[in-house]
A protein has these predicted regions:
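Gly/Ala-rich beta-loop-alpha elbow adjacent to hydrolase catalytic centers
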Residues: 156, 160, 164
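Alpha/beta hydrolase fold serine-hydrolase catalytic domain that processes acyl esters and thioesters
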Residues: 150, 165-313
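Short amphipathic alpha-helix adjacent to the substrate-entry channel of hydrolases
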Residues: 94-114
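A glycine/proline-hinged amphipathic helix-loop "lid/cap" segment
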Residues: 1-68, 310-313
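Alpha/beta-hydrolase active-site loop
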Residues: 122-144, 301
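Short beta-strand-to-loop junctions in surface cap/lid or active-site-entrance loops
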Residues: 58-60, 66-76, 233-238
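Gly/Ser-rich "nucleophile elbow"/oxyanion-hole loop immediately N-terminal to the catalytic nucleophile
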Residues: 139-154, 174
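Short beta-strand element of the alpha/beta-hydrolase
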Residues: 76-86
Length: 313
């Protein structure tokens, strides 16, 4: 399918206004540019869950900023944890705010969006350590937050999808964490950058291969890019992982590694579902102001997470 016209215009506008590549800019400017990108014209107007509260979650190196979203104050919903994208170097709970509001309303889950330490100031394994610490704390403190006690749904997009996948893998041997299912949105799964979809050009996608290469160098200083702690695609054992929903996009350099991971999970006996959205780009679920598929993803997530909880959408 052809690239969605609204997304094609978005890419053209980005290219026309790019004066320097990210690695040529101060990291503060990179982060500001990412914040400024998410305008209401792209994200859509923010819906209003009844409850939106900023939190601080204990982390391994100090408190982690987080935000709780609940569609109703008078109901204890299950917890869904969300880790934002941004290539490990940018992004945060503010950039994902509109999406998490939509997610809480559609899924009838209490969504907790968690910040983690960013590279290059805090390289690997800081983000993994923060994700694990937050999942462990939330697994045992749902009641304090007014949510339903029970196993979590772990979710994330892009770099955050990587953190969710790695945390789910670690949780199998960590009794502090109870994970019911995982929702991975265009997740980073292969630091070797070797899948065929990496050939997509900058005029076809929002995150070309050279941007990914820079993100990975900022985050991970190790020589083994097949380490399961950064590349879940190369994990030697995937058995026993929680059920997974993996969402990919046709015009995304990460598309094929997502498809490969689905096959590996299926071979390991994991319940997994995957949808590749035609005509879409990386991060499209955040772009409700541009494409209707953004809401389709939220509804797909709601259908995936709710049967196991007995909640009717």
């Amino acid at each position: 399918m052809a690239l969605d016209p609204a997304l094609h215009r978005l890419i053209e506008d980005k290219l026309a206004h790019t004066r320097a590549r990210q690695w040529e800019m101060p990291i503060a400017d990179v982060r500001k540019g990412f914040r400024d990108f998410w305008t209401p014209a792209i994200t859509g107007q923010p819906p209003a869950p009844e409850r939106v509260e900023d939190l601080t979650i204990p982390g391994p190196a100090g408190g982690l900023r987080a935000r709780l979203y609940a569609s109703r104050r008078d109901r204890r919903d299950p917890l869904l944890v969300f880790y934002h994208g941004g290539g490990y170097v940018k992004g945060g709970i503010d950039e994902s705010d509109v999406f998490c509001r939509r997610l809480a309303i559609a899924t009838r889950h209490a969504v907790v969006s968690v910040d983690y330490r960013l590279a290059p100031e805090y390289p690997f394994p800081a983000a993994v350590d923060d994700a694990i610490a937050s999942a462990a704390w939330l697994s045992s403190h749902a009641n304090e937050l007014g949510a339903r006690t029970g196993p979590l749904v772990l979710s994330g997009e892009s770099a955050g999808g990587n953190l969710a996948a790695v945390t789910c893998s670690r949780a199998r041997a960590d009794s502090r964490m109870a994970i019911r299912s995982q929702v991975l949105l265009q997740p980073v799964l292969d630091f070797t950058l070797s899948c065929a979809s990496m050939a997509l050009s900058a005029s076809e996608c929002l995150v070309p291969r050279d941007d990914l290469e820079w993100y990975y160098r900022m985050y991970y200083g190790g020589s083994d890019r097949k380490s399961p702690d950064v590349s879940p695609l190369f994990a030697p054992d995937l058995a026993g992982l929680p059920a997974a929903l993996i969402v990919t996009a046709e015009y995304d350099t990460l598309r094929d590694e997502g498809a490969k991971y689905v096959g590996l999970l299926q071979s390991a006996g994991v319940d997994v579902r995957c949808t590749c959205y035609p005509g879409m780009v990386h991060g499209f679920q955040q772009m409700a102001g541009l494409v209707t598929a953004a809401q389709d993803v939220v509804e797909e997530i709601a259908a995936f997470v709710n049967p196991a909880t007995g909640i009717a959408v």
